[in-house]
Amino acid sequence: MSGKSAAKFSPAGRLTAEDLGAIHLIGAGGVGMSGLARLFLTRGISVSGSELREWPSLAGLRALGGTIHMSHEVANLDGVDTVVYSSAIPSDHLELVEARRRGLRVLHRSEALATAMTGRRTVAVAGTHGKTTTTSMVTMVLQQAGVDPSFVIGGEISEVGSGAHHGTGDYFVVEADESDRSFLIYRPFVSIITNIEADHLNTYGDLANLEAAFADFARLTDPDGFIITCADDVGGRRLAETLRAEGRRVYTYGISTDADLRLTEMASSTRGIRYLAEIDGRSLGEFRLPVPGRHMGLNSASAVLAEYLLDLPLEAAQSALAAFPGVRRRFERKGVADDVLVYDEYAYHPTPIALALRTLREVAGDGGLIVVFQPYRLYRTRDLQAEIAEALAIADELVLLEVFGPGELREPGEGSAALIEAVPLPVDRKVFVDSWDAAPVEVARRAKPGDVVVTMGAPPSSLMGDQLLDALSRRGAAGPAGTVPGGDVGGATTIGGTIPDIPGGSTPDASAAG
């Protein structure tokens, strides 16, 4: 399907989720769309969806009473009042075209989500990276405080097993997506902006336009509410200065001496991270998380600051963060095979790539670090090639897959073949594999006992963890490290890669689709 989504968004109004009638979601299996479906179903709303692949989330939707069609066809719209699509759905998708022909209400995912927020105090988390983890932390802190928030997150909280919940309380926590400007729909009571860096330049053109969009998002915050951003981030600091000059209520966090919530004595190890927090010279005590990484500490500080400003008990923040289980695909431990530890990480932008690999280096200790990376989107790989290449070189070895860019056309010289040349690693420590099945074979050939391997990048790369563990296990059963049954590296592919069981029309939705 060649058409591109041409979404034009309407601001959130007084329309409620119940006003939408029977809802149909095109591409219901991705994290963002399945979370929205779960939210509507638990509110007692009739929900159907269409998919081409049996995503793990679909069983849960069926159990809640959702109807899932394993096809895309016009008959799926019979009895439907509202059709919901994401930015990953092309404008010429047959169900989208048919919905408009029938005169059905057609809403972008963000517009549909906004209806669920009507009458609630929304806490919206935006930023170039760290959104999903931060949204999860804010959610758990509010849950621990006993306010039972509703939430929709672009990932699954590991122990909860879900990225959405319809709560009984006044608060609604949402991950706000800037990639297509749809975060400008929301009218938050609290806006959290983790950081601002160049990304989604296919939408914004340059960093200045992106920063302007984040400022516009912050200006939508309720005058009685407040804006939170990171004093340690250059973009966040600029945003705070701009908004404060306009008389808006802005609060910052970080290790910077002028941060409103100042973090001191921050220490990270393989067991997690700890820091002390103070505001206006008053100590708020010690905060600990069982996940490592300075960036995790900064993410958690925004949740602490929100809890403080909402006048909720800080003890709730301390206990919630101390038990934070992590989020699927965010520093997720997949398992161990033949004494090789395998992780999965969603990072695809240079900054989170670097942060994740540095943290994994701590985990690896004296062992090696191998990254299996699948770039996400051709435009990003092209525009940020030098920065991505430099970040990947933090690893000891690189196994590179082809770019995952559904709907994108590759120009000569673009893609992973160009990226591999730019990575400043020795030739024998980096390899571009042009077929999906070749990657586990290559990892099993390279990994030594004591090494750490991480799958990283586009959504499909999360599917490789079990294959890696299987290849490593078979290697261990077969003999010494470095030998593995299997074929040669190689094979033809396309921009999307030869990814098992993901038909071209069924890609992860926009909330997970950079």
From Swiss-Prot:
Region of interest: Disordered: 495-514
Catalytic activity: UDP-N-acetyl-alpha-D-muramate + L-alanine + ATP = UDP-N-acetyl-alpha-D-muramoyl-L-alanine + ADP + phosphate + H(+)
EC code(s) of this entry: 6.3.2.8
Biased composition regions of type Low complexity, renumbered to the chain: 495-505
Gene3D superfamilies hit by this protein: Mur ligase, C-terminal domain (3.90.190.20), Mur-like, catalytic domain (3.40.1190.10), NAD(P)-binding Rossmann-like Domain (3.40.50.720)
Entry's localization field: Cytoplasm
Positions with a binding annotation for ATP: 127-133
Primary subcellular site in the record, as a coarse category: cytoplasm
Assigned GO CC terms: cytoplasm
GO terms under biological process: cell division; cell wall organization; peptidoglycan biosynthetic process; regulation of cell shape
Keyword terms, alphabetized: ATP-binding, Cell cycle, Cell division, Cell shape, Cell wall biogenesis/degradation, Cytoplasm, Ligase, Nucleotide-binding, Peptidoglycan synthesis
Pathway(s) annotated for this protein in UniProt: Cell wall biogenesis; peptidoglycan biosynthesis
The keyword Nucleotide-binding is annotated on this UniProt entry: yes
InterPro entries found in the cross-reference section: Mur-like_cat_sf, Mur_ligase_C, Mur_ligase_C_dom_sf, Mur_ligase_cen, Mur_ligase_N, MurCDEF_pg_biosynth, UDP-N-AcMur_Ala_ligase_MurC
Gene Ontology molecular function: ATP binding; UDP-N-acetylmuramate-L-alanine ligase activity
NCBIfam families linked: murC
Family in the record: Belongs to the MurCDEF family.
Family matches, as HAMAP family: MurC
Primary role: Cell wall formation.
Protein name from the UniProt record: UDP-N-acetylmuramate--L-alanine ligase
